[in-house]
Amino acid sequence: MPPLPPLLGARRAPTDPSGDTAPDCSGAIDGCFDGTFDDMFDATFDDAELRTARTAFAQGRRQAARSLLRHTGDDWDRRGHRLTMLAREPYAVAWARDWLHAEPGSADAAALYALARVQRALRGKEDPDRARETCATAAVLAPADPTPWLGLLQLARTLGPEREVLGTFAELRRRHPEHHHAHHLLLARLAERPSGGRAADDHEVYDLAELAAAEAPADSPLAVLPVVAYAERYRVLAATGLAPADPAASGHWSGPRARRILRACFDWWLEWEHDEHPRRHIDLNHLAFALSCAGRPAEAAVLFRRIGRHATPAPWSYAHRDPRAAFRTARARALGH
C-alpha cells in the first residue's frame, strides 16, 4: 500500500471560540458526557464480553478483564477498543500497576497501564509526558501491537503538535494499516486545519479521507471515512461560528462532492456491512447523521433501524448539542414518528 501524503506544514485551527480542542468523541467516551451513560449510549458498542468484563472490573473482580484481553489476541481494532474502555475505569491505573508488578513481562498489563494513564492525562489528572513514557514502555514489550501507539495518538490528538500526530499515526499505521480508531483521530485533528481560502467542498481532510478509503481493501470499514471527515469539518465550522448550530440547516452536505460521497458510502454499507467489527456502530451513526442532515430520510431510516439502541455520542453532540435529543429528533423525523 503506498503511503498517505505527509500533509505537513499546516497550522492548526481553533475548534471553538476559546481555542480549546474538542474531546475525542469518536464513540461512547466518558469525557463527552461527564462520565454518565444511559441505555441509549452503550460504551461497549454492543460487545457483550467487554460489558461483562467491565462490570466485573468495576466491582473489583479482575480475572474477566485478564481473560478478555488474552482471548482478544491480535484483533487490533477490538483490542484497542477493549483496552480503551477498560482503561477508563476509575481504578484501572492501580490495578494495572499491581498486575505489572506480578507479571513484569505482560504486554496486556503494560498496555492497560499505559492507556489508563493516557485517560488520566486527558482528564488533566496525569502528566502527559509520564503517560507517554508508559506507552513507550508498552510498545517495547509488544513491538507489533499498535495499541500503545493508539494511546500516544490519543494524547497527540488533544495535547500535541501536528507533527506528533502525524508521526504517531505513521507508526501505528505501519503496524495496522486499517486501524479504525486511529484514522478517526487523525481526521478529527486535520479537520481543524484552516481552509486556506479553498472552497467549502475542497478542504484537505476530505482529500485524505477519500485517499485512505480508496487505498483500503474493498470490504474495509475505512470506506466510511469520507462521511466522518464531513462530520468533523462541520464540528469545526460550527464551533468557530462559520456554520449554523443546526447541522440540517447548514447546507454542509448539499454540495456535489458531499452528495457523491454520501451515495458511495451508503452503497458501500449496503454491500459490505460488517456485523462483527467492534466499532461498526460509530460508522452507522455517522452515516445516519449525514443522511439526516442532507435531507435523505428514507436512507437515514434504514440506518436508524439498524442502529436500534446503539447510538454513539459523536456526531450527534457536534455543535455542542444534546446528543440524546439530537439523535431522537433525527430518528423520529426519518421514521415518521
Language model regions located:
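Alpha-helical repeat scaffolds
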Residues: 65-68, 92-103, 127-137, 162-176, ...
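Extended, charged low-complexity segments
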Residues: 277-337
